[in-house]
Amino acid sequence: MKYQQLENLECGWKWKYLIKKWKDGEAVTRYIDTSEADAAIAELRKLEHEPTQVLAWIENHMSEALDNKLKQAIRAKRKRHFNAEQVHTKKKSIDLDYRVWEKLSNRANELGCTLSDAIEYLLSEASRSEKASMKVSSLKEDLSKLLSS
C-alpha cells in the first residue's frame, strides 16, 4: 500500500533517526577519520530546526550501510503515521500472559476468527450473560415478594 510522502515531516523523522543512531554509538557518517565524522555530526545537529536540509546532509555525509535501514524505518513510520489517522486502522497493543494468550488463541481457532474478533465475541457474550443473570435475579425478587405477601 502506498502512502503520501510529506517532505517536512519525513525529514524530521530522518533527522531523529540519525541522531538516535549516533547517540547509540553507530557510525552514521561515511567517514573513517573521526574529525571528519565529528564535523559532519556537528553539522547534522545544527539542522534540527531545518528539516529539509537533512536530505542534503544525507546525500553528502551518510554511511552507505545505513541507507537501506533508514528507508525501511521511514517507510514503517509513514505507514504507522497514516494508519493512526483512521480509527479502524489504528493499532493498539495489550500484554497477555502466555497461558491467557494460548486460551484466547484456541478459542479464536474454534470460532474461526482473529484474536480481536474473539475478544469482541467473548465480551458481547459476557454482557449478554450478565444481563440475563440480572433479569433472573429481578424475577426471583419479584417472585419472593409476591409469595411473601
Swiss-Prot record:
Domain of life: Bacteria
Keyword annotations from UniProtKB, A to Z: Cell cycle, Cell division, Cytoplasm, DNA-binding
GO biological process: cell division; regulation of DNA-templated transcription
GO MF terms held by the record: sequence-specific DNA binding
Cellular-component GO terms for this entry: cytoplasm
The keyword Cell division is annotated on this UniProt entry: yes
Cellular localisation: Cytoplasm
Pfam family, one: MatP_C
Subunit relationships: Homodimer.
NCBIfam families on file: PRK05097.1
Function: Required for spatial organization of the terminus region of the chromosome (Ter macrodomain) during the cell cycle. Prevents early segregation of duplicated Ter macrodomains during cell division. Binds specifically to matS, which is a 13 bp signature motif repeated within the Ter macrodomain.
Protein family membership: Belongs to the MatP family.
UniProt-recorded name of the protein: Macrodomain Ter protein
Organism annotation: Vibrio campbellii (strain ATCC BAA-1116)
Organism placement in taxonomy: Bacteria, Pseudomonadati, Pseudomonadota, Gammaproteobacteria, Vibrionales
